[in-house]
From Swiss-Prot:
Catalytic reaction list: octanoyl-[ACP] + H2O = octanoate + holo-[ACP] + H(+); decanoyl-[ACP] + H2O = decanoate + holo-[ACP] + H(+)
Keyword Electron transport: no
GO molecular function: acyl carrier activity; fatty acyl-[ACP] hydrolase activity
Effect of mutating residue 315 to A: Reduces thioesterase activity 7-fold
Compartments reported by the entry: Plastid, Chloroplast
Top-level taxon of origin: Eukaryota
Protein name in UniProt: Acyl-[acyl-carrier-protein] hydrolase FATB1, chloroplastic
Effect of residue 352 to A/S: Reduces thioesterase activity 1.5-fold
Signal peptide as annotated in the record: none
């Protein structure tokens, strides 16, 4: 079809059931009727005389050659199709260029359609994101993985991914109008000197993105108990729609002056509730606290960890992402070289500042989960005060799983179904 459209511009196609009409010169089309004019022969030139034994017919027409004139008589026999002269044919290079251009344009169009068909928002919506997006309760952002965000394995580090999760949460607060004076603080929170602190984080990694990949992150809020809220994230590959990472977190209110946890005041709850989604978390929470282990039984200990100025966040305490880096400091090097982190659960117990000196302890968990190795972690101050407890799961490298999120039915705070 594409080639026919291209060639029709050069060769007009007659309508069905019609045939070309002969011109005045017999079967020749009028556009191809030959016209001969006698030319004068200059002095000294050769004069050519027609051979009397010339063939009486040429191209199906009787030809009588006389001095200076050409007469044709219509041949009653069947005539072959008219022929076109070479100088009347189109420029073949132009024709080939036109055909090539059409094919290239068609190929690009099909490529674009094929990529659009793989976009995450056109795949099966297993958690009802489309409906939540229509309600304006989901924030969606895209990030490209930079060269300085990858590690020795040429994949994005867990710290990079957590920074992107935090960035989408802050942008989500801004889009909802909750960015009053500080990161995610509502007017009621500012009035009561309240700030958000992260108390628990869960991450499950199906596959780590690599340098140059573009990922899309969807995040939304939901209520969590009486003193906080939960935040969920889905990280997917922009090109294929594959879900790479799932994460969920719990945030609590803390008084900025007393540094103690606080319940949500009524006015703050009224500000937040319209933006909550009544939906199951993307990672099921078993509500079991991480068990404490004896530091003396630890398999690996890293001491003398001290925060730097750049490790502090806007609330003047160490960023929650920095704790993850400290936890991994005590992992055995042979594990880091042969395995990759696929599951992470972190409980934040206390904050620490510039003057803190910490130690990171790691112990092997004897229990197994599908052949994956498990470890328990403890980050504490030198005086023995617990700062962070964690549990991690590791799998052999290049053994990523295609985790799927079960279909769930959710409702927004105004009662709309999002399944």
């Amino acid at each position: 079809m594409v080639a026919a459209a291209a060639t029709s511009a050069f060769f007009p196609v007659p309508a069905p059931g019609t045939s070309p009409k002969p011109g005045k010169s017999g079967n020749w089309p009028s556009s191809l009727s030959p016209t001969f004019k006698p030319k004068s022969i200059p002095n000294g030139g050769f004069q050519v005389k027609a051979n009397a034994s010339a063939h009486p017919k040429a191209n199906g027409s009787a030809v009588n050659l006389k001095s200076g004139s050409l007469n044709t008589q219509e041949d009653t026999s069947s005539s072959p199709p008219p022929r076109a002269f070479l100088n009347q044919l189109p420029d073949w290079s132009m024709l080939l260029t036109a055909i090539t251009t059409v094919f290239v344009a068609a190929e690009k169009q099909w490529t674009m359609l094929d990529r659009k068909s793989k976009r995450p928002d056109m795949l099966v919506d297993s958690v009802g994101l489309k409906s939540i997006v229509r309600d304006g309760l989901v924030s969606r952002h895209s990030f490209s993985i930079r060269s300085y965000e990858i590690g020795a394995d040429r994949t994005a580090s867990i710290e990079t991914l957590m920074n992107h999760l935090q960035e989408t949460t802050i942008n989500h607060c801004k889009s909802l109008g909750l960015h009053n004076d500080g990161f995610g603080r509502t007017p009621g929170m500012c009035k009561n000197d309240l700030i958000w602190v992260l108390t628990k984080m869960q991450i499950m990694v199906n596959r780590y993105p690599t340098w140059g990949d573009t990922v899309e992150i969807n995040t939304w809020f939901s209520q969590s108990g009486k003193i906080g809220m939960a935040s969920d994230w889905l990280i997917s590959d922009c090109n294929t729609g594959e879900i790479l990472i799932r994460a969920t977190s719990v945030w609590a209110m803390m008084n900025q002056k007393t540094r103690r946890f606080s319940r949500l005041p009524y006015e703050v709850r009224q500000e937040l509730t319209p933006h909550f989604v009544d939906s199951p978390h993307v990672i099921e929470d078993n509500d079991q606290k991480l068990r404490k282990f004896d530091v003396k039984t630890g398999d690996s200990i890293r001491k003398g960890l001290t925060p730097r100025w750049n490790d502090l966040d806007v609330n003047q305490h160490v960023s929650n992402v920095k704790y993850i880096g400290w936890i991994l400091e005590s992992m055995p090097i042979e594990v880091l070289e042969t395995q990759e982190l696929c599951s992470l659960t972190v409980e934040y117990r206390r904050e620490c500042g510039m003057d803190s000196v910490l130690e990171s302890v790691t112990a092997v968990d004897p229990s197994e989960n599908g052949g994956r190795s498990q470890y328990k972690h403890l980050l504490r101050l030198e005086d023995g005060t617990d700062i962070v407890k964690s549990r991690t799961e590791w799998r052999p490298k290049n053994a990523g799983t295609n985790g799927a999120i079960s279909t769930s039915t959710a409702k927004t705070s105004n009662g709309n179904s999002v399944s």
